[in-house]
Amino acid sequence: MAKITKTFQYGKHTVTLETGEVARQASGAVIVKMDDTVLLVTAVAAKSAREGQDFFPLTVDYQEKFYAGGRIPGGFFKREGRATEKETLISRLIDRPIRPLFPEDYKNDVQIIATVMSLNPDVDGDIPALIGASAALALAGTPFMGPIGAAKVGYKNGEYILNPTVSELADSQLELVVAGTSNAVLMVESEAALLSEEVMLGAVTFGHREMQKVINAINELTVEAGTKPSTWEAPAKNDALISALKEAIGPRLGEAFQVRDKLQRRDAISAIKKDVFETLAGRVAAEGWNPAELSKEFGELEYRTMRDSVLDTKVRIDGRALDTVRPIAVKTGVLPRTHGSSLFTRGETQAIVTITLGTARDGQVIDAVAGEYKENFLFHYNFPPFSVGECGRMMGPKRREIGHGRLAKRGVLAVMPSLEAFPYTIRVVSEITESNGSSSMASVCGSSLALMDAGVPVKAPVAGIAMGLVKEGERFVVLSDILGDEDHLGDMDFKVAGTAEGISALQMDIKIEGITEEIMKQALQQAKAGRLHILGEMAHGLTAPREELSDYAPRLLTIKIHPDKIREVIGKGGSTIQAITKETGTQIDIQDDGTIVIASVNAIAAQAAKARIEQITSDVEPGRIYEGKVAKIMDFGAFVTILPGKDGLVHVSQISSDRVEKVGDVLKEGDVVKVKVLEVDKQGRIRLSMKAVEEGDAASAE
């Protein structure tokens, strides 16, 4: 196939899509160029599904190569290793709007690989990767119901910005990524500076309107490439099997969904499934039906039963009204030796959240393609198997845990103090101890309480809520504080975090078309009411940060010295700084601009270290009296150390009012003496006098 190119203007950027020259053995491949950021995005679809495959095996891998930024990776091996947190998050970002656009029965392996091969530090790879994935799938001839477009939206001075650069995002009040088809929004991911629901919804509609340029360009590209439509056909439904299944179940599934407790409801449904399968075992064998298909159709009936029930009765499977939030219980200071902690429980979802405060050196150094930087606010989310009553392997964080942790971090980021105002590295860890829906939002609530318990000066408390939507035709219901079952069986789920003032994070995933702006507006208003209710419940724990840090948290003292004095504080081979830290038991960080941060659990020790540093960096004042130690005896006098690294000469004539024949007769090395500074000459040499101190004392006595 000849090389085909499509170019269009997208905000301030020129975007070019190329296909037909590179990676021609992939099912679909496209080079995406956005200014100097260049990605190769490929899609490969298997010709058939694997035997026994019962789910859609879509894999998305986004990777940033260090050569893209003209850098060699750090570390021993000097090559890219496992996926970074950023790569994992962008992989999930691509997956979320693409997955719902494949038919339910499509079970062929599909792999998308997006590789950043050239990186303009001002143009991130996320939007080009989403565009490339959409184009590659459209070219691959899969039963993909796309293409999709994607846009990043900023907000500044009351105006939306399309695809802002990294520099523009630095002072933007919003960073929102939206993806969708020509008719529908499918995915929203955002971080905001406490904006209103109206501004957030406006950003979504603005981004969806602008992304039509992307969709049109991809459609033109596939036409020019002569892409053949997919020949895949969904397997025919087995009406006899479905009819037999419905008859065997009867009204029991509807009754099971009236059981309000999650585990009891799960057990009731499992018992029905087991009984039905045993009842139909003979017929399944006689008719040659596939047991896997029977299981799948049982799941489909579960889905329909729950949806019909909530649409008809407006009562949910746990008995709540549509907008009711589950009972909330909060505790703070639950772990005595941590620097801050909380226990947040909402229904059957629970999180223990801890805060650890460290110094700037405890920050995480990120070796990124665009350059190395340090992260001083860390948020880690853990989801152990016991939280859902299951056994499982304990290993490193999975993609889901990384994604949920990032969402929770976005939720509280808008209220965090600057590093200048609160010079600590802050690590938040959310341990999910129970889960039945929206553990990420429980992490937001728990982290807000734990931060206040730790005395971190957050601007305001933050709460998060997960919302759901069930829609059939014109009928729809919006659900507040969804359960795990409602998340899986609904048409839209979205999570909103924020303060009483506004939204700090919004994540939205939509599985169907037909979600109008009015529906989203209603859902956001219902979410606001739920968020305010949760904030009210959280106020029973804490309403503002504690005035004092934990007894076990390090106290930080910050002082500023002239950068030229840094070498004096460090000393030869680090001897001075090492001596101070060893003698005072403190940890000392020195920055290039002369900022020194002293950390110690003991406030007295921190003050002692501060005094030592101030001594070292202070200038010697003529006329001032110092207490010093005799460092060296010479024939013509003695050198006395009056400040660390600062020695002055007491000439033999300045030792005493009486005549001194031999310096060693009066002074010995190590003697502590009082001296007065007579002069500091242009070369920095210090003249001292013991005699002047004697004479001053004598004059005072008279």
UniProtKB/Swiss-Prot annotation:
Main localization category: cytoplasm
Top EC class, one word: transferase
Enzymatic reactions: RNA(n+1) + phosphate = RNA(n) + a ribonucleoside 5'-diphosphate
Taxonomy, superkingdom: Bacteria
Domain S1 motif: 623-691
One Gene Ontology term of the molecular function aspect: polyribonucleotide nucleotidyltransferase activity
Keyword Transferase annotated: yes
Listed CDD domains: KH-I_PNPase (cd02393), RNase_PH_PNPase_1 (cd11363), RNase_PH_PNPase_2 (cd11364), S1_PNPase (cd04472)
InterPro entries: ExoRNase_PH_dom1, ExoRNase_PH_dom2, ExoRNase_PH_dom2_sf, KH_dom, KH_dom_type_1, KH_dom_type_1_sf, NA-bd_OB-fold, PNPase
Enzyme Commission number: 2.7.7.8
Domain KH intervals: 554-613
Keywords for this protein: Cytoplasm, Magnesium, Metal-binding, Nucleotidyltransferase, RNA-binding, Transferase
GO BP annotation list: mRNA catabolic process; RNA processing
Positions of Mg(2+) binding: D487, D493
Disulfide partners: none
Places the protein is found: Cytoplasm
Co-factor(s): Mg(2+)
GO cellular component, one term: cytosol
Family: Belongs to the polyribonucleotide nucleotidyltransferase family.
Assembly information from the UniProt record: Component of the RNA degradosome, which is a multiprotein complex involved in RNA processing and mRNA degradation.
Known function: Involved in mRNA degradation. Catalyzes the phosphorolysis of single-stranded polyribonucleotides processively in the 3'- to 5'-direction.
Protein name, UniProt field: Polyribonucleotide nucleotidyltransferase
Lineage, broadest ranks: Bacteria, Pseudomonadati, Pseudomonadota, Gammaproteobacteria, Lysobacterales
Gene, per the UniProt record: pnp
